Amino acid sequence: MELRYGAIATEGTVLVRAFDAVQNQDLETLRYWNQWWSAWRDTEELRNQSWQMGRSLCRLGGALEPGLVPYVQACGEVCNFVIAFGTIAAYWQLPLPDVVSAYLYSWLSNGINAGVRLIPLGQTLGQQMLLALHPSLEYATHKALTQEDQDLGGWSHGMGMISSQHESLYTRLFQS
Protein backbone atom coordinates (compact mmCIF):
# COMPACT_ATOMS: atom_id res chain seq x y z
CA MET A 1 0.00 0.00 0.00
CA GLU A 2 2.79 2.41 0.88
CA LEU A 3 4.35 2.12 -2.59
CA ARG A 4 1.01 2.95 -4.18
CA TYR A 5 -0.45 5.60 -1.86
CA GLY A 6 2.06 6.49 0.83
CA ALA A 7 4.73 9.09 1.34
CA ILE A 8 7.28 7.09 -0.65
CA ALA A 9 5.03 7.26 -3.73
CA THR A 10 5.01 11.05 -3.46
CA GLU A 11 8.74 11.04 -2.76
CA GLY A 12 9.30 9.26 -6.07
CA THR A 13 7.50 12.05 -7.91
CA VAL A 14 9.50 14.71 -6.03
CA LEU A 15 12.65 12.89 -7.16
CA VAL A 16 11.46 13.25 -10.76
CA ARG A 17 10.85 16.99 -10.22
CA ALA A 18 14.34 17.50 -8.79
CA PHE A 19 15.90 15.51 -11.63
CA ASP A 20 14.02 17.56 -14.24
CA ALA A 21 14.98 20.85 -12.57
CA VAL A 22 18.67 19.97 -12.72
CA GLN A 23 18.36 18.75 -16.33
CA ASN A 24 16.82 22.14 -17.18
CA GLN A 25 19.33 24.01 -14.98
CA ASP A 26 16.37 25.54 -13.16
CA LEU A 27 17.67 26.35 -9.68
CA GLU A 28 14.45 28.09 -8.63
CA THR A 29 12.37 24.99 -9.34
CA LEU A 30 14.90 22.84 -7.50
CA ARG A 31 14.61 25.17 -4.49
CA TYR A 32 10.81 25.07 -4.71
CA TRP A 33 10.64 21.26 -4.59
CA ASN A 34 13.14 21.11 -1.75
CA GLN A 35 10.98 23.50 0.28
CA TRP A 36 7.81 21.70 -0.78
CA TRP A 37 9.15 18.35 0.43
CA SER A 38 10.30 19.86 3.73
CA ALA A 39 6.85 21.33 4.33
CA TRP A 40 5.10 18.12 3.30
CA ARG A 41 6.83 15.93 5.90
CA ASP A 42 4.55 15.02 8.79
CA THR A 43 6.94 15.47 11.70
CA GLU A 44 10.12 17.18 12.73
CA GLU A 45 11.75 13.76 13.03
CA LEU A 46 11.03 12.90 9.39
CA ARG A 47 12.24 16.32 8.21
CA ASN A 48 15.44 16.08 10.24
CA GLN A 49 16.11 12.57 8.97
CA SER A 50 15.74 13.72 5.37
CA TRP A 51 17.88 16.82 5.96
CA GLN A 52 20.66 14.87 7.68
CA MET A 53 20.83 12.27 4.92
CA GLY A 54 20.59 15.00 2.29
CA ARG A 55 23.39 16.96 3.92
CA SER A 56 25.63 13.88 3.89
CA LEU A 57 24.85 13.08 0.26
CA CYS A 58 25.40 16.72 -0.77
CA ARG A 59 28.77 16.74 0.95
CA LEU A 60 29.78 13.57 -0.86
CA GLY A 61 28.41 14.80 -4.18
CA GLY A 62 30.20 18.14 -3.87
CA ALA A 63 33.47 16.38 -3.07
CA LEU A 64 33.11 14.10 -6.10
CA GLU A 65 31.67 16.68 -8.51
CA PRO A 66 32.47 20.35 -7.77
CA GLY A 67 29.97 21.31 -10.50
CA LEU A 68 27.17 20.19 -8.17
CA VAL A 69 27.85 22.98 -5.69
CA PRO A 70 25.50 25.56 -7.32
CA TYR A 71 22.64 23.06 -7.21
CA VAL A 72 23.30 22.22 -3.58
CA GLN A 73 23.51 25.91 -2.70
CA ALA A 74 20.23 26.56 -4.51
CA CYS A 75 18.46 24.38 -1.96
CA GLY A 76 19.36 26.78 0.82
CA GLU A 77 20.28 25.86 4.37
CA VAL A 78 18.96 22.30 4.14
CA CYS A 79 18.64 19.83 1.30
CA ASN A 80 16.33 16.85 1.51
CA PHE A 81 17.75 13.43 0.66
CA VAL A 82 15.36 12.92 -2.26
CA ILE A 83 16.41 16.27 -3.75
CA ALA A 84 20.11 15.50 -3.31
CA PHE A 85 19.63 12.05 -4.86
CA GLY A 86 17.75 13.43 -7.86
CA THR A 87 20.26 16.25 -8.29
CA ILE A 88 23.28 13.97 -8.39
CA ALA A 89 21.56 11.46 -10.67
CA ALA A 90 20.59 14.20 -13.13
CA TYR A 91 24.06 15.75 -13.01
CA TRP A 92 25.52 12.36 -13.89
CA GLN A 93 22.90 12.02 -16.66
CA LEU A 94 21.63 8.66 -15.43
CA PRO A 95 18.43 7.33 -17.03
CA LEU A 96 15.50 8.73 -15.04
CA PRO A 97 13.37 5.54 -14.97
CA ASP A 98 16.32 3.59 -13.58
CA VAL A 99 17.01 6.29 -10.98
CA VAL A 100 13.41 6.28 -9.74
CA SER A 101 13.24 2.49 -9.67
CA ALA A 102 16.55 2.24 -7.79
CA TYR A 103 15.44 4.86 -5.25
CA LEU A 104 12.15 3.12 -4.56
CA TYR A 105 13.82 -0.30 -4.46
CA SER A 106 16.31 1.00 -1.90
CA TRP A 107 13.43 2.18 0.31
CA LEU A 108 11.64 -1.15 -0.05
CA SER A 109 14.77 -3.19 0.59
CA ASN A 110 15.63 -1.17 3.71
CA GLY A 111 12.16 -1.79 5.15
CA ILE A 112 12.31 -5.50 4.49
CA ASN A 113 15.84 -5.74 5.89
CA ALA A 114 14.63 -4.10 9.10
CA GLY A 115 11.88 -6.72 9.28
CA VAL A 116 14.38 -9.51 8.67
CA ARG A 117 16.40 -8.30 11.68
CA LEU A 118 13.61 -7.33 14.07
CA ILE A 119 10.84 -9.88 13.56
CA PRO A 120 12.94 -12.07 12.48
CA LEU A 121 11.69 -13.06 9.06
CA GLY A 122 14.76 -14.81 7.73
CA GLN A 123 16.77 -13.93 4.63
CA THR A 124 14.88 -16.22 2.26
CA LEU A 125 11.48 -14.85 3.23
CA GLY A 126 12.86 -11.32 2.91
CA GLN A 127 14.00 -12.02 -0.64
CA GLN A 128 10.66 -13.65 -1.47
CA MET A 129 8.90 -10.52 -0.23
CA LEU A 130 11.08 -8.31 -2.43
CA LEU A 131 10.25 -10.48 -5.42
CA ALA A 132 6.52 -10.50 -4.63
CA LEU A 133 6.51 -6.69 -4.36
CA HIS A 134 8.12 -6.19 -7.76
CA PRO A 135 4.78 -5.36 -9.49
CA SER A 136 4.12 -2.68 -6.85
CA LEU A 137 7.61 -1.30 -7.43
CA GLU A 138 6.97 -1.11 -11.18
CA TYR A 139 3.63 0.61 -10.54
CA ALA A 140 5.21 3.16 -8.18
CA THR A 141 7.99 3.89 -10.66
CA HIS A 142 5.50 4.47 -13.48
CA LYS A 143 3.32 6.64 -11.23
CA ALA A 144 6.30 8.77 -10.16
CA LEU A 145 7.29 9.33 -13.78
CA THR A 146 3.80 10.30 -14.96
CA GLN A 147 2.04 11.94 -12.00
CA GLU A 148 0.90 15.55 -12.36
CA ASP A 149 1.65 18.11 -9.65
CA GLN A 150 -2.02 18.58 -8.74
CA ASP A 151 -2.29 14.84 -8.00
CA LEU A 152 0.52 14.77 -5.44
CA GLY A 153 -0.36 13.55 -2.01
CA GLY A 154 -0.21 10.43 0.04
CA TRP A 155 -1.80 8.37 2.73
CA SER A 156 0.52 6.62 5.13
CA HIS A 157 -1.68 4.65 7.56
CA GLY A 158 -0.82 6.63 10.64
CA MET A 159 2.87 7.10 9.86
CA GLY A 160 2.67 10.70 11.07
CA MET A 161 1.17 9.63 14.40
CA ILE A 162 3.72 6.87 14.89
CA SER A 163 6.56 9.22 13.97
CA SER A 164 5.23 11.81 16.44
CA GLN A 165 5.29 9.20 19.20
CA HIS A 166 8.68 7.84 18.13
CA GLU A 167 10.42 11.22 18.08
CA SER A 168 9.65 11.70 21.78
CA LEU A 169 10.93 8.29 22.95
CA TYR A 170 13.81 8.23 25.40
CA THR A 171 15.50 5.28 23.65
CA ARG A 172 15.22 4.18 20.02
CA LEU A 173 16.39 1.11 18.10
CA PHE A 174 17.21 3.02 14.92
CA GLN A 175 18.42 6.56 14.42
CA SER A 176 15.80 8.53 12.54
Predicted features along the sequence, with ranges:
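Short alpha-helix boundary/capping elements
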Residues: 7-8, 23, 112, 141
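A short, ordered amphipathic alpha-helix with a cationic face
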Residues: 3-7, 73-76, 102-104
